[in-house]
A protein has these predicted regions:
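GST-like domain detector, emphasizing the conserved glutathione-binding G-site
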Residues: 1-109
């Protein structure tokens, strides 16, 4: 089972969890306590050298970091329902909303 390194309450892992739920994908949640700086431990830095959460660890041990690339990976595994858009306009519109959230809204949190 794929593992999602998470910190409860953090917005980026929450995005991945919502996405996985919509896809009916079960992920093992691994709490990485940022208050204790577990995300900066040598073990975690092997999974993601930037020391950021979320990280998706695949069954073969490879890791994907950042919420959008993780969601795109999950989309490729389970294409229905399509959550990234089906035509050029939908894809562009969804991408623009994602960028707005990342650059305008979450920078204020």
């Amino acid at each position: 089972m794929m593992k999602l390194y998470d910190f409860p309450g953090a917005p980026n892992p929450r995005r991945v969890k919502i996405f996985a739920e919509e896809k009916n994908i079960t992920l093992e949640l691994i709490n990485c306590d940022m208050a204790k700086r577990e995300h900066k431990s040598p073990e975690f830095l092997k999974k993601n050298p930037s020391g950021k959460i979320p990280v998706l660890e695949l069954d073969d041990g490879r890791c994907i970091s950042e919420s959008i690339p993780i969601c795109r990976y999950l989309e490729s595994l389970v294409p229905d329902p399509n959550l990234f858009g089906e035509d050029a306009f939908e894809i562009s519109f969804i991408e623009s909303r994602n960028r707005h959230i990342e650059l305008e809204l979450w920078t204020q949190i």
